[in-house]
From Swiss-Prot:
<dbReference type="GO" id="GO:0015979">
    <property type="term" value="P:photosynthesis"/>
</dbReference>
<feature type="transmembrane region" description="Helical">
    <location>
        <begin position="34"/>
        <end position="54"/>
    </location>
</feature>
<feature type="transmembrane region" description="Helical">
    <location>
        <begin position="68"/>
        <end position="88"/>
    </location>
</feature>
<protein>
    <recommendedName>
        <fullName>Photosystem I assembly protein Ycf4</fullName>
    </recommendedName>
</protein>
<dbReference type="InterPro" id="IPR003359">
    <property type="entry name" value="PSI_Ycf4_assembly"/>
</dbReference>
<keyword id="KW-1133">Transmembrane helix</keyword>
<dbReference type="GO" id="GO:0031676">
    <property type="term" value="C:plasma membrane-derived thylakoid membrane"/>
</dbReference>
<comment type="function">
    <text>Seems to be required for the assembly of the photosystem I complex.</text>
</comment>
<comment type="similarity">
    <text>Belongs to the Ycf4 family.</text>
</comment>
<dbReference type="GO" id="GO:0009522">
    <property type="term" value="C:photosystem I"/>
</dbReference>
<keyword id="KW-0812">Transmembrane</keyword>
<keyword id="KW-0602">Photosynthesis</keyword>
<dbReference type="Pfam" id="PF02392">
    <property type="entry name" value="Ycf4"/>
</dbReference>
<keyword id="KW-0793">Thylakoid</keyword>
<keyword id="KW-0472">Membrane</keyword>
Amino acid sequence: MSSESKSSQSEKELSGLVLEQKIKGSRKVSNYLVASMLSIGGVGFLLASFSSYFGRDFLPLGNPSTLIFVPQGLVMGLYGLAAFLLAIYFWRLINIDYGSGVNRFDKNKGVLSLSRRGLFKNIEIEIPIDEIKAVKLEVREGFNPLRRVSLRIKGRKDLPISRVGSPKPLLDLENEGAEIARFLEVNLEGI
């Protein structure tokens, strides 16, 4: 047997003992759109404010130089500054891919490792697999729907492990929960 086939065989054996799930973060189309709109709107309001202060048109549309600086130009400048600062925050979240990470269930080591990208540092949690009692599916409909997979852990609160954001379809949620429960050989609750 060649070394190449031995390595692929050992990878297959390891894949049966390790389950790894990638979690998407804040790099979503909706976040890019919001950050872009805030940037464009913030710059537009700031330019309108500067136009009213200096008496020159810095914007190609309209005639903002005719605005009275106090109070209209000043308020537009404050709105522009607030939008621009919020846009910087959104671009920072997108840049670091806030919330992304990995769920790694490793039967070799007997450990569940969760890692997520935080705003200022990465968050890493390790829990022994034998402390996991069940996989729980949480579904709440209504104005603020909730659909997530969480783990029931001995002596602790439930630990959510699915991504935050728009609700997943129920079939995907059930399949994800069933895959984890089958791998860990624990019960699946909440169906």
